From Swiss-Prot:
GO terms for cellular component: cytoplasm. One of its GO terms (molecular function) is calcium ion binding. Its main location: cytoplasm. It comes from the Eukaryota. Involved in calcium binding and microtubule stabilization. Pfam families: TCTP (PF00838). This is Translationally-controlled tumor protein homolog. It is found in: Cytoplasm. It comes from Brassica oleracea. Belongs to the TCTP family.
Length: 168
């Protein structure tokens, strides 16, 4: 199995269990998330609850929670939204932090494509949810989530150059 970690922080952000499609000249990866239910596991331990003290099943939480698979699997943490000015400031900082960690070939690809990717992302800012890895570092790679027109499941966008492939 391959896990993709944040190149800047080491937080796990994605795995090969979630297929991706390259967009914006390979600068962004597009991944489809799915809503799933979590919780409400019925366990039959063979005991006769009516014969034991306590009556009701005490201490059993059978609540059901709807979660998005990618957010839940990688414990992504939602962040406040960005306005255009804040997003541009983040992108400038991100480029400055990420570029030295890339090979010269990757740096060239990233520099060529980041402007187009930024122009692709800017009009969608109001529609995005922003996530970072579990560590919630200030310098984290942002993962963007939004709903395509008519979709019931979210689509996630990752900066491809900000991910490091790790074999597990």
């Amino acid at each position: 199995m391959l896990v993709y970690t944040d190149l800047l922080t080491g937080d796990e952000l994605l795995s090969d269990s979630f297929p991706y499609k390259e967009i914006e000249n390979g600068i962004l990866w597009e991944v489809e998330g799915k809503w799933t239910t979590k919780g409400c596991v019925e366990v039959n331990i063979g005991a006769n609850p009516s014969a034991e003290e306590g009556g009701e099943d005490e201490g059993v939480d059978d609540s059901v929670e709807k979660v998005v698979d990618i957010v839940d699997t990688f414990r992504l943490q939602e962040q406040p939204t960005y306005d255009k000015k804040g997003f541009i400031a983040y992108i400038k900082k991100y480029i400055k932090l990420l570029t030295p960690k890339l090979t010269p070939e990757q740096q060239e690809e990233f520099k060529k494509g980041i402007e187009g990717a930024t122009k692709f992302l800017l009009p969608k800012l109001k529609d995005f949810q922003f996530f970072v890895g579990e560590g919630m570092h200030d310098d984290s790679t942002i993962v963007f989530a939004y709903y395509k027109e008519g979709a019931t499941n979210p689509t996630f966008l990752y900066f491809a150059h900000g991910l490091k492939e790790v074999k597990c």
